[in-house]
Structures are given as C-alpha cells and as structure tokens.
Amino acid sequence: MHINHISVGNRLLPLSFQCAAGEKVYVAGPNGSGKSTLLSAIAGTLSSREGVKGEVLINETSLLTLPLAEQAIYRAYLCQQSRPAFNVDVFQMLALSLPAGRHVVEPEVQAAVRRVVELVQLQDKLHRSVQALSGGEWQRVRLAAVCLQVWRSLNPYSQLLILDEPAAPLDVAQAKWLYQLIDEMAAQGLVVIVANHDLNRVYQHADKVLLLNQGVLTAYGSADEVMSVENLQQVFETPVKKVAVDGQPYLIFT
C-alpha cells in the first residue's frame, strides 16, 4: 500500500509512506499532531472541500477516487468512541457489519463471528442491547464489527484496517484482547494502521511507527529507529529514558 503526498489543508502537511501486507503501522504523536486527521484522510471520510489532497494506492486501486460504498470493500475504519445510534442487540449489530452478500447462516460466517467474539470476549453479551453496554463493552462490539467487515475469509478484497485510538475506552485486560485482535487481522494479510497514545504499547507491537508533530511527519520506520530518545524528547518535549525489564524495552517519561 502506498500513501502518496496525502495532506489536509494546514492540519496535515504532505506526507508519503508505504507498507506491506500484514504490517502493523502505529501512528504516534502529541495531542493535536494530526493522527486522527491522517487516519480519516486515508479512510476517505474527509471531502475535498476539507482540503484533502493526495492518493491512497492499494494494489494499483486508487482508494480515494472510489465512492464510499466501494471503498468499504477494501478498507474498514473505526473512528474514536461513539455511542450507539439505534437500539439492537449485539448479535444483530455484528450481522449488520458483515460484508455485502454474506449471511449469518453460512458456516464461514459463523466461524468468523465465533472467532472475533472469542477474541474480544463477547460470548455472554450477544443478546444484550447495545444501549445497555458499558463504554468498554460497546468499544469491543465496535471492534468486532469493524473487523468482520474486512475479515479475509468473508471479504477476499479486504486490504486495510484503520483504528483510531481503539484502546482508549478499554481497561488493562480488554486492551490485551485488542492487541490479540490486531495481530489476528495482520496475520490474515491486512495492513493495520492504528493511532495510539500509549507509547510503550506502540514500541512493543508495531512493525512500523509513523511519528507526527504539528501535522508534520517527523519519522517513519521500525520502532527502534523512530522511537529513539532523541526523537521522543523532541516531539513530546519531556525527558525520556529507555529501560529494560525482563529483556523487554520500556519508555519512562519524567
């Protein structure tokens, strides 16, 4: 996948990068750095009237030139937290999220739903109204739904999953399930782009890191390359240390 000279007015200055199938790309940066703007621009949810320029190429398909309904064949996008717009139970919500032409009675669909429900631990919530869920429960439903849209066995055209701060409403245990779900989607061959404010999670889970500051691409590459003490101190304007715990590197901000 190639992102070529994507920009959004003065909120996001032109930037380009590319990533391979199955890569997990984490977008990091301070509040207001342009993370959500970048993700929504890649997802095609911003119009040209909002100053969007550039292209997103997926296997030579120019994603942003397609109508939104056609874009949804190739990519799924989870924006930041929203409340349910209507009252259905969790199972119905998941059924509504299936790719066009797929039905819950199909064995392949049932297997995919079982797997994603297991990954985010929704087994006991399937017949509960979405209006009765806590914030963390609703976020897990949203995650399951967006993943079913591009679940590779149900949608062979799917290429890209975009998640904007998906861990924000989740507790520690639920966040663990989220990262397992992201690993599952990447293992299916999708590019997964995630905005995340937890820099230690970014460091531990990313194949590539894209570091933004004030709408400008500061660095792009492996976590070790991008998340250097020098880069992080420059962007976040706070002292940073790297320490090892049981052989695993961690960042400490002081």
From Swiss-Prot:
ABC transporter domain boundaries: 1-239
Protein's name in the database: Vitamin B12 import ATP-binding protein BtuD
Primary residence: membrane
Cystine crosslinks: none
PROSITE patterns assigned to the protein according to its UniProt record, in alphabetical order: ABC_TRANSPORTER_2 (PS50893)
Origin species: Vibrio vulnificus (strain YJ016)
UniProt keyword annotation of Transport present: yes
The enzyme's E.C. designation: 7.6.2.8
Chain's gene name: btuD
Task of the protein: Part of the ABC transporter complex BtuCDF involved in vitamin B12 import. Responsible for energy coupling to the transport system.
The family this protein is said to belong to: Belongs to the ABC transporter superfamily. Vitamin B12 importer (TC 3.A.1.13.1) family.
Stored PANTHER family: METAL TRANSPORT SYSTEM ATP-BINDING PROTEIN TM_0124-RELATED, VITAMIN B12 IMPORT ATP-BINDING PROTEIN BTUD
Superkingdom as given in the UniProt entry: Bacteria
InterPro entries in the cross-refs: AAA+_ATPase (IPR003593), ABC_transporter-like_ATP-bd (IPR003439), ABC_transptr_BtuD (IPR023693), Metal_Ion_Import_ABC (IPR050153), P-loop_NTPase (IPR027417)
Subunit-structure text: The complex is composed of two ATP-binding proteins (BtuD), two transmembrane proteins (BtuC) and a solute-binding protein (BtuF).
Molecular function as annotated in GO: ABC-type vitamin B12 transporter activity; ATP binding; ATP hydrolysis activity
